[in-house]
């Protein structure tokens, strides 16, 4: 076998359909486009127009909506955390910022730990959420599951605190200051 004997598979190469080359060819005159009108012309055709038939966007019902404040959640399984421990990337504590780095999630803001897999090392894990099974497995191994209150973006905006501390600090409600009327 050599390069000169290679051929494409049967049926893989088709001849180009040559249109507008005389009536005898079967595709002459109007070149298979019918008579006059928008669709006989070259260029743009309205993709929505279905020629009198109710178009698909009106045949199908409206469905659902997208909440504007939805948080995108990045999930991490216990099996992945165990792998990181075995590789020596984690020693005894795993914070939200380390999760962001280890997951290669540059725009992730909210992390949830799921209970798929087993964990044997006693590790303190800080994340925004834990499944019940993950929390049970972590505490059974002698570790600690700490729930972060703020997202990374919110924690970065807190003044006078490091990001790690701000993640755990509860949000305070704004208190409206009311001036008391002075008695005359």
Curated annotation (Swiss-Prot):
Question: Which residues are the signal sequence here?
Answer: none
SUPFAM superfamilies, from UniProt? Ribosomal proteins L15p and L18e
GO MF entries:
rRNA binding; structural constituent of ribosome
Ranges for region Disordered: 1-50
Q: Where is the composition biased (Gly residues)?
A: 21-35
Which terms in the GO cellular component ontology are assigned? cytosolic large ribosomal subunit
Q: Give the UniProt keywords, A-Z.
A: Ribonucleoprotein, Ribosomal protein, RNA-binding, rRNA-binding
Write one Pfam family the protein is assigned to.
Answer: Ribosomal_L27A
For this chain's UniProt record, which GO biological process terms are given? translation
Q: Report which superkingdom the organism of origin falls in.
A: Bacteria
> Subunit details for this protein?
Part of the 50S ribosomal subunit.
Q: What does this protein do?
A: Binds to the 23S rRNA.
HAMAP family, per this entry? Ribosomal_uL15
Give the family from UniProt.
Belongs to the universal ribosomal protein uL15 family.
Q: What is this protein called?
A: Large ribosomal subunit protein uL15
């Amino acid at each position: 076998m050599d390069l000169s004997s290679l051929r494409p598979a049967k049926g893989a190469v088709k001849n180009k359909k040559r249109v507008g080359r005389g009536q005898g060819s079967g595709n002459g005159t109007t070149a298979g486009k019918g008579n006059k009108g928008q669709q006989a012309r070259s260029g743009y055709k309205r993709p929505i127009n279905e020629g009198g038939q109710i178009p698909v966007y009106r045949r199908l019902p409206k469905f659902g909506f997208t909440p504007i404040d939805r948080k995108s959640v990045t999930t991490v399984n216990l099996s992945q955390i165990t792998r990181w421990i075995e590789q020596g990337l984690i020693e005894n504590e795993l914070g939200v910022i380390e999760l962001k780095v280890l997951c290669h999630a540059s725009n992730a803001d909210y992390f949830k730990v799921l209970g798929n897999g087993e964990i044997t090392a006693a590790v303190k894990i800080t994340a925004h959420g834990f499944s019940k099974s993950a929390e049970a497995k972590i505490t059974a191994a002698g570790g600690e599951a700490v729930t972060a209150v703020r997202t990374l973006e919110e924690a970065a905006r807190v003044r006078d605190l490091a990001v790690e501390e701000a993640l755990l600090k509860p949000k305070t409600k704004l208190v409206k200051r009311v001036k008391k009327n002075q008695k005359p």
